[in-house]
Amino acid sequence: MVIHTKKQVKTKTIHKRMSLPQNLRDKIDEFWNEQVAKNPNLFNGEVWNVTKMEENKDNIFLTIEKTDYAHYLYDERHGIEEKYACHNLAGGTYIVTKDGYAVIGELDEITSYPRMMQVSGGGIDEKYDIVNGEFDLIKTAKRELKEELNLDLDNKEQIENYNFEYIEKPEGKRHSYCVILKAYSIYTENQLEEHFNKYYQFLEETDGEKEFKKLHFLKLGRAVEELDKLDNPKRLYVRQLLEIEDKGVLNNE
């Protein structure tokens, strides 16, 4: 479920690892070994699980604790009861081009979700995203956008401005939280596509880590209609976000 909000999102960290029953941990480990055998590029890094969400008139507070990517992926693929589900926390960026196109990425074949459509983003990282003892989700979004699309949110020649705009909350079998910035790019659709294609070629030539295979540009006002024509798997929040964006354009908001 996507919520449109201007509130700042802050974290409260519990410095312990999430405890899982041994029989569930065994299933997760067996599943993970099977996935790595299919795709050696996978890495079982740290993931942060949201245990509680609170808010006041200005802020949203997320209490988090550690788990791992295997736990997250198992939950995504097979589902886990709410008590032990992985409510992972991520930060991302939704981009709008200068000429009014929503930018949605298509994950590369080497990722854990080939062809999946989603915005740029990823999990918070203790090595890079800490400010004053807590996670800064803007830093997460900036880091992921630079790694995945070679775009710098602070570069005025690429991005005009950005704001907190959306937060994804758990819904149905998807247990994730994702804080999503909205960024207005200086680039047009054609310019951003050219920029990305050059970056993708660079990653191929240097054996760099690729997240997205291509970008899809969906004209705001009819973005959901264009999205529905694509047969790719899609993150649940993508359609919900674009419904809000289409409505805003059609109502001149």
Give residue spans per PLM region:
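N-terminal leader/linker segments that precede catalytic domains of diphosphate-processing enzymes
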Residues: 1-119, 123-143, 151-253
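Active-site recognition of the HExxH zinc-binding catalytic motif
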Residues: 147
